């Protein structure tokens, strides 16, 4: 998980490889989506330098912070807690959390748990997660 990698190790060992990978994918015309489990807050400056199109954000990370660091063009997905919100929560809790995510992230944003959804998740919670959320703002 990202929370176990220091910024120094990330910048020295991982970021150069990610840069090469992202450059190669973009050279082929691909959009690039990054998924990193865990708290990536301390890695955001390096991630911002990659030119990502989409990033998945774990529930441990502030969407507001990610938006500030990565900017308005990167699509964000996340960041409901897969256990507390989706597995053990209620449809109403999920709807409320999604509304908060939209407010915090702004657009572009995709509904996502930020990590794997447990297989024992109640069907009504999955349906609530998949409901379209119409937010018009004020």
What are these regions (language model features)?
Residues 1-138:
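Active-site loop segments of alpha/beta catalytic cores
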